[in-house]
Amino acid sequence: QAEFNFKEDYTAYLPYTTNDKQPMPMAFQNVYDITPLSKAQPKLAFLPVTVDCGSVKLTLLESDLEAYPGVFVQSQQGKYGLKGVFAPYPAKTDFYPWRKQEYVTETTDFISRSRGSRSYPWRVLAITEKDTDMPVNNLVYALASPNRIGDTSWIKTGKVAWDWWNDWNLKGVPFKAGINMDTYKYYIDFASRNG
């Protein structure tokens, strides 16, 4: 159980989940709702979440989260706080063939199944005095597991095209656009021509 209680009705920055019927399986993408804690919607919000406490900002986030459920937060209606909500462990799953994605159809009453020794995620409360301190706070990196892939010097920033966007947006080509080899080849050739 996790609760985050505050002494006043501070302003919270909450990115709510986008599916009210099944709030946990999501893309973790949304705009932030800026609201007093007492007026926060009863929906689940995903991390990071920031609470402006006046002289400092407190940001809830996670580090080293692998093969374990992340925490969501939910308003404690009418109170100045947020409570942690954890995704239950899947009992049964099914498969969306068109998305090549597994989804949960039934859950258990526990959050994880684990064997042997392992590390567990860090739940982090990062406190900053200025907004400019937020993006340079390295606490999440310091708490994370060490690099397991070795040399990363070959990784460069750049542009990307995702499968689901390829399927929706590619027009005027001599093949059926979609999540298929012709679409991937087209994007590879385009990238090669345009650097």
Task: Locate predicted features.
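N-terminal accessory beta-strand-rich subdomains and adjacent acidic, glycine-rich linkers
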Residues: 1-147
